[in-house]
């Protein structure tokens, strides 16, 4: 298994020790104990932390259920694309924002891309993984997001591009958001989170536990509802 070294994300020595042990394949009893202390019963789980799952079906079910509980009509934002179908499909598979983004006021969301340079448009600063809620809609219908630190950001569509030899071969455009109630471990790669709820009892791929755990900045932000040995391999 190949692991990217992303130690800059964490600021917790004990947590770094656990992650290093998983990465090097030298997980010991003390590392299991460290993680076992983060096992949390349902009543103790934070309401606003995203849930990480191994399987898409769990993610889709939780996001759809949470959105349905909110009052009001959902607004839909459809992805647009340019270029050859096969190239566009590849971009869409790698894009964290869905082809059709459904939002309601009050929905928990996560940014799926880093913000453009400060000079670009009206968007505030955000990174891939910034959490917030839909606070309302701009005059042109674009979602206004209130982030966890109180920043209000009016979102606009952004592009994901496939370039070859300096030329753009295909591109997709979508608002850089997704519902943040749940996501797959795979889709969380590259994100940096303050907290996440994760069930690693069903981890089925080598490295999956490492990817999930290393999304979170510190051990106190990890909420485990299940863990199997495979997750730490």
Segments (PLM) and residue ranges:
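Conserved helicase motor core of P-loop NTPases
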Residues: 1-127, 135
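C-terminal accessory regions
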Residues: 107-233
């Amino acid at each position: 298994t190949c692991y990217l070294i992303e130690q800059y994300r964490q600021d917790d020595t004990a947590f770094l020790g656990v992650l290093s042990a998983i990465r090097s394949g030298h997980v010991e009893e003390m590392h299991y104990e460290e993680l076992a202390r983060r096992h949390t019963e349902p009543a103790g789980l934070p309401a606003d932390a995203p849930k990480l799952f191994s399987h898409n079906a769990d993610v889709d079910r939780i996001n759809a259920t949470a959105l349905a509980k909110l009052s009001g009509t959902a607004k839909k934002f459809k992805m647009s694309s340019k270029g050859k179908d096969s190239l566009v499909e590849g971009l869409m598979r790698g894009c964290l924002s869905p082809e059709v983004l459904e939002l309601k006021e009050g929905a928990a969301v996560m940014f799926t891309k880093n913000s453009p340079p400060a000079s670009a448009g009206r968007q505030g600063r955000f990174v891939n993984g910034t959490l917030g809620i839909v606070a309302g809609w701009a005059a042109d219908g674009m979602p206004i997001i209130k982030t966890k630190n109180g920043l209000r950001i009016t979102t606009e569509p952004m592009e994901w591009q496939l370039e070859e030899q300096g030329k753009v071969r295909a591109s997709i455009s979508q608002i850089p958001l997704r519902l943040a109630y749940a996501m797959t471990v795979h889709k969380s790669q590259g994100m940096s989170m303050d907290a996440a709820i994760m069930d690693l009892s069903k981890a089925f791929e080598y490295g999956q536990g490492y990817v999930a755990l290393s999304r979170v900045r510190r051990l106190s932000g990890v909420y485990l509802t299940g863990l199997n040995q495979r997750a730490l391999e």
